[in-house]
């Protein structure tokens, strides 16, 4: 089994939802670990990369079959599932950064909330439209994917809508 390390660089605030709210303060919270630190679940990264690879089918001989081999295949019609040959761990802050943040109780500085409201055609705020979202300030996240099959030359730096980039090494 081989290990490929990856790093996600963010160029703006980001949000990976926990599905939870903070009462009247924030409608949507960022997913956090036990130390109140942000992370992105491995399954989320796997899904993002699967979708990105579907966008570049044909590049470097990338085919739908190779994507299915890497990420797995699910046929709801036949209730058939085949596990892929790559497995992703959660993307987290660098270990030294985690230690510093936890030791000095700095996790609150990683987050910024934004509030917005819907405006009608007359420039007036719509009733009950005030929303607030918690975001994470740009910090790189990293971790590993484990490959248990043979593939090469398909992972390249991927940039998504100029907000973040994933580099593999």
Language model segments and positions:
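RNA-binding basic/glycine-rich loop and surface signature characteristic of RAMP-family CRISPR effectors
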Residues: 1-117, 123-169
């Amino acid at each position: 089994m081989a290990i490929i390390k990856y790093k996600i660089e963010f160029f703006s605030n980001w949000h990976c939802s926990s599905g939870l709210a903070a009462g009247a303060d924030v409608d949507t919270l960022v997913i956090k670990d036990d130390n109140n630190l942000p992370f992105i679940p491995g399954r989320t990264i796997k899904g993002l990369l699967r979708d990105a690879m579907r966008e570049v089918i044909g590049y470097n001989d990338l085919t739908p079959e190779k994507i299915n081999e890497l990420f797995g295949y699910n046929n709801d019609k036949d209730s058939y599932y085949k596990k892929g040959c790559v497995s992703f761990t959660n993307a987290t802050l660098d270990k030294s950064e985690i230690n510093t943040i936890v030791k000095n109780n700095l996790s609150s500085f990683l987050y910024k909330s934004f509030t917005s409201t819907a405006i009608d055609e007359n420039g007036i705020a719509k009733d009950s439209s005030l929303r607030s979202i918690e975001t994470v300030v740009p910090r790189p996240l990293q971790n590993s994917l484990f490959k248990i099959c043979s593939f090469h030359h398909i992972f390249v730096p991927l940039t998504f809508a100029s907000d973040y980039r994933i580099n593999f090494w």
